[in-house]
């Protein structure tokens, strides 16, 4: 799924990871990716908010996110380990992340469509802007 996220977000992700169990491994990967994502943005003005919808066979998934430094995550993911991945990523990346399942019965399709739509939303959210998109002077302090 990391390869799927990389492809759909247009991010270059290369990593090697080992862990004492699946839960810790997936959590550590999500935290590392989230922190790296946050650091890479370096305070430059970006679109910040984005939504992407993906259909994959029976699954119809929408991801909406906001890079606003008030982390939150809500997901309809059918597998607790992937739910934990999304939450760990959102908290570490300082994003508000919502992944909504409109349709679907095959867990694999739901999970893969979730990673695809999150990747597409991340790609759109990091597009550069000339000015910060906020009604406040500054959304985040460096």
List the model feature ranges, each with a label.
Residues 2-142:
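Polyanion-binding surfaces on beta-sheet-dominated domains and ring/shell assemblies
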């Amino acid at each position: 799924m990391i390869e799927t996220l990389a492809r759909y977000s247009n991010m270059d992700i290369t990593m090697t990871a080992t862990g004492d169990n699946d839960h810790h491994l997936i959590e550590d990967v999500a935290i590392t990716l989230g922190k790296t994502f946050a650091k890479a943005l370096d305070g430059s003005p970006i679109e910040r908010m984005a939504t992407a919808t993906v259909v994959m066979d029976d699954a119809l998934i929408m991801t909406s996110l906001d890079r606003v430094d008030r982390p939150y995550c809500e997901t309809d993911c059918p597998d607790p380990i992937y739910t934990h991945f999304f939450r760990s990523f959102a908290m570490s990346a300082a994003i508000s992340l919502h992944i909504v399942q409109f349709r679907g019965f095959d867990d694999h399709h739901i999970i893969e469509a979730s990673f695809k739509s999150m990747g597409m939303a991340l790609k759109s959210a990091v597009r550069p802007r000339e000015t910060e998109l906020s009604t406040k002077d500054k959304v985040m302090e460096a």
